[in-house]
């Protein structure tokens, strides 16, 4: 079983959020986008696998032009672990950040982000005409302006243009 943890896998570092991910350790693989809560540039993603052989079965190729670069022994040929043959050292940036910031501090920052979404929800509910579409969870709260005097169709017509220009606040 694969878990798409692109956004949510970072909750494993959070004291409060990790309870939402009970059972994730049973998965065969997890994808995780470190650029989504870990102060990384876009494109810093990780795939964690229980069995390396699954990556090898998925991506291994043996073109003639790579035969002279083949490794012997227990070291993997990294081109057999993913689709890119040449890749930037994205993992080094993540590793360095983890060494400097630490997993405990990242957990605190994620917990803080989740608390801020809950606080935003409380503030939004204080104003008439605003409704919560999806309650605060994992650092996100979805809301819209929906005055009672307008129908759902009118509220949608009012909010659609806003969603094109203001995706996040």
Locate each region found by the language model.
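Conserved core segment of the aminotransferase class I/II
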Residues: 47-76
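Conserved small/polar residues in nucleotide/adenosyl-binding loops
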Residues: 165-169
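Conserved PLP-enzyme active-site core in the AAT-like
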Residues: 1-56
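Conserved PLP-binding catalytic core of the aspartate aminotransferase-like
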Residues: 131-162
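Non-catalytic, mobile gating and regulatory segments of ester bond hydrolases
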Residues: 3-7, 125, 130-131, 152
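A glycine-rich phosphate-binding loop feature that marks nucleotide/adenosyl-phosphate handling sites
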Residues: 6-10, 62-65, 134-142
């Amino acid at each position: 079983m694969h878990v798409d943890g692109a956004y949510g896998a970072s909750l494993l570092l959070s004291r409060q959020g990790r309870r939402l991910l009970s059972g994730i350790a049973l998965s065969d693989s997890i994808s995780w986008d470190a650029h989504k809560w870990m102060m990384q540039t876009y494109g810093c993603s990780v795939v964690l696998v229980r069995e390396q052989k699954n990556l090898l079965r998925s991506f291994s190729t043996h073109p003639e032009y790579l035969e002279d670069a083949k490794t012997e022994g227990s070291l993997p040929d990294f081109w057999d672990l993913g689709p890119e043959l040449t890749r930037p050292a994205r993992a080094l940036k993540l590793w360095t950040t983890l060494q400097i910031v630490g997993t405990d501090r990242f957990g605190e920052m994620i917990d803080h982000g989740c608390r801020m979404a809950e606080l935003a929800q409380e503030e939004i509910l204080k104003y008439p005409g605003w409704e919560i579409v999806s309650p605060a969870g994992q650092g996100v709260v979805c809301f819209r302006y929906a005055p009672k005097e307008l129908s759902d169709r009118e509220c949608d017509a009012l909010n659609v243009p806003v969603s094109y220009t203001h995706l996040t606040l």
